[in-house]
């Protein structure tokens, strides 16, 4: 169990006079990696950026949750220190942590643990980055055993690819409709009239009472709009930003397929014309039909994701004996490496799609609950004002 809660925002001032907002992150967990079951640290936005950077660097091929949008602070009275801006950022940072803490791979990352607990987070970040770079530069030869993987996996996995595109398309459509509906509703609330036509038979005293009630409703409507912005609209936009991350994964897969097909054409050409390239692999003639006959990779809802420790860099495609862009590399070797990269990418894409489905369900339910909560607060405020008046 790993539960993170952001609370107690605080405006702090540096010696230089610069101000920033820090947030308390309270963590509850029964994981043995933590000394305490409940603890807290204070973090600012730059610390979240560091976490996002190191996760993106070490967990390539995974859909790392995006950071909150950098809203145009000029649209908020008070800029980045305005209550509305801080509320929206807190909401998005909470969503970011929720996604990370429930992700089957990221939630087991030492980077995540250190972010939540280490008081010297900045120092840890720089050391971890340097160690990651050193491990990456050493490389690792993973070209062995590729023939056996070719017999078991289909690099194209067309059904997985189509499923991913359809899921993202449907999510985009639903989110756009929901956001449009919310904006229209907020506009109708914002245009709530303050003046009303006065019937000829209405006394001045009654008119004053009605006018006061309308002004009171207008004030409550402003609170409702602000609450909608900081909670509901922000939640929808955070989901839209998450979709962008998955779209980039789809584009990356398309590029890898093209790369695989490019090397496949080169090897086939060399096999058909062996005199044109002394470096062609003689075994490719036997390997090629196997690729075409392998069964298609089907998405499975019960995929188990393997985790990685901090210093075994969990990059899905480490440096190899041959670089895919190296001119003097063996074409067959490049084809095999490209094939392996694509197969591993397919596996991770399937895992990420399963997680995305769960997050869409959880976050949409949470958004609808926010809509209800906003209106409960709105009508409760009106009733409380009437109670005080009486």
From Swiss-Prot:
SUPFAM superfamilies: PX domain. It is found in: Cytoplasm; Membrane. InterPro entries: PX_dom, PX_dom_sf. Belongs to the sorting nexin family. The PX domain binds phosphatidylinositol 3-phosphate which is necessary for peripheral membrane localization to the perivacuolar punctate structures. It is a peripheral membrane protein. A 1,2-diacyl-sn-glycero-3-phospho-(1D-myo-inositol-3-phosphate) binds at residues 44, 70, 89. It comes from Schizosaccharomyces pombe (strain 972 / ATCC 24843) (Fission yeast). GO terms for molecular function: phosphatidylinositol-3-phosphate binding. GO terms for cellular component: autophagosome; cell division site; cytoplasm; cytosol; early endosome; membrane; nucleus; phagophore assembly site. GO terms for biological process: endocytic recycling; mitophagy; piecemeal microautophagy of the nucleus; protein transport; reticulophagy. Its main location: cytoplasm. This is Sorting nexin C1711.11. Keywords: Coiled coil, Cytoplasm, Lipid-binding, Membrane, Protein transport, Transport. Gene3D superfamilies: Phox-like domain. Residues 1-123 form the PX domain. CDD domains: PX_Atg24p.
């Amino acid at each position: 169990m790993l539960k993170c809660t952001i609370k107690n925002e605080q405006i702090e001032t540096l010696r230089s006079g610069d101000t920033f907002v820090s947030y308390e992150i309270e963590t509850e967990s029964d994981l043995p990696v933590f000394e305490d079951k409940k603890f807290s640290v204070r973090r600012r936005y730059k610390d979240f950026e560091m976490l996002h950077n190191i996760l993106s660097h070490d967990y390539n091929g995974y859909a790392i949750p995006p950071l909150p949008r950098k809203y145009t602070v000029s649209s908020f009275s008070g800029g980045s220190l305005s209550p509305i801006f801080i509320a929206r950022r807190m909401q998005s940072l909470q969503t970011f942590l929720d996604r990370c803490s429930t992700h089957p791979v990221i939630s087991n990352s030492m980077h995540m643990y250190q972010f939540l607990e280490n008081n010297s987070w900045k120092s840890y970040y720089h050391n971890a980055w340097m160690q990651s770079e050193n491990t990456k530069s050493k490389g690792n030869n993973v070209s062995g055993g590729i023939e056996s993987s070719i017999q078991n996996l289909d690099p194209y996995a067309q059904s997985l690819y189509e499923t991913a595109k359809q899921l993202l398309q449907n999510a985009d459509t639903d989110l756009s409709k929901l956001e449009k509906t919310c904006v229209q509703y907020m506009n109708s609330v914002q245009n709530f009239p303050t003046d009303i036509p006065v019937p000829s038979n209405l006394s001045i005293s009654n008119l004053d009472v009605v006018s006061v009630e309308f002004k009171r409703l207008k004030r409550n409507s402003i609170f409702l709009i602000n609450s909608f912005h900081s909670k509901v609209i922000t939640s929808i936009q955070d989901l839209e930003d998450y979709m962008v991350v998955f779209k980039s994964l789809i584009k990356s897969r398309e590029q890898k397929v093209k790369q695989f097909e490019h090397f496949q054409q080169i090897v086939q050409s060399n096999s058909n014309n062996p005199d044109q390239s002394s470096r062609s692999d003689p075994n490719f003639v036997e390997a090629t039909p196997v690729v075409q006959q392998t069964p298609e990779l089907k998405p499975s809802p019960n995929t188990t994701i393997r985790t990685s420790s901090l210093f075994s860099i969990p990059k899905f495609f480490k440096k190899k004996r041959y670089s895919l862009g190296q001119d003097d590399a063996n074409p067959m070797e490049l084809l095999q490496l490209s094939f392996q990269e694509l197969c591993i990418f397919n596996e991770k894409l399937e895992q990420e799609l399963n997680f995305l489905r769960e997050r869409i369900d959880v976050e949409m339910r949470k958004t609808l609950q926010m809509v209800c909560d906003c209106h409960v607060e709105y009508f409760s405020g009106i009733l409380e004002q009437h109670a005080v008046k009486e």
